[in-house]
Amino acid sequence: ATLDKIRDSYITNHPDLNPDFIFAFPAYNVRPNEIGAVIGRSQLKRLDENNKIRRRNLDCFLSRLDPSKYQTDFVVEGSCNYAFTFVLKEPDTALRDRVEQTLRKHCVEFRRGLSGGGNQLRKPYLRKIMGNEFERYPNVNHVHFFGWYIGNYPGLAQGKIESLCQLLNGL
């Protein structure tokens, strides 16, 4: 079978998963250690300032997001988020689809289900072992289907964050 056929098979057999993040086998992230170390060390001198900017960006995002549609009451004290996390307050597949269409239309990179592409218990590699255990976690399942994250970069202009919130709130 070709890679496309294998991928299509996983997508067909797992309609509850985001097709961009179907993990068939347990694995781990492998990154080049030396280059990562050089880049990381070069960024240390800007770490505190970048963290302040990320916190300010997150405050801007959460304060402008419509709390009647999206969860905004996250505990953020002491944290520095690399991403804007947003989750629909209520399950709404039509709104979810409009959110994703709008983000794609405006070339906003996002990941549904938050880090790792959603509820890992739904992924083929764990479902083989755990069966339907995922059903016992309704909050995780809600985030799986109705939550996203968008990168929170220190160079991100406040105006873009405000425009993003206007787009999301207008849906």
Show where each model-derived region lies.
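Conserved PLP cofactor-binding pocket of PLP-dependent enzymes
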Residues: S9-N18, C60, R98-P138, H142-W148
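C-terminal/domain-terminus segments
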Residues: G159-L171
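FAD-dependent oxidoreductase catalytic-site/capping-region signature
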Residues: L58-D59, T72, N81-V108
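Short alpha-helical functional segments enriched in proximate histidine and acidic residues
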Residues: R64, H106, L171
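Conserved PLP-binding active-site segment of the aspartate aminotransferase-like
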Residues: N81-D92, L121-E133, F145-G159
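Active-site region of PLP-dependent enzymes
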Residues: A1-A83, G117-G118
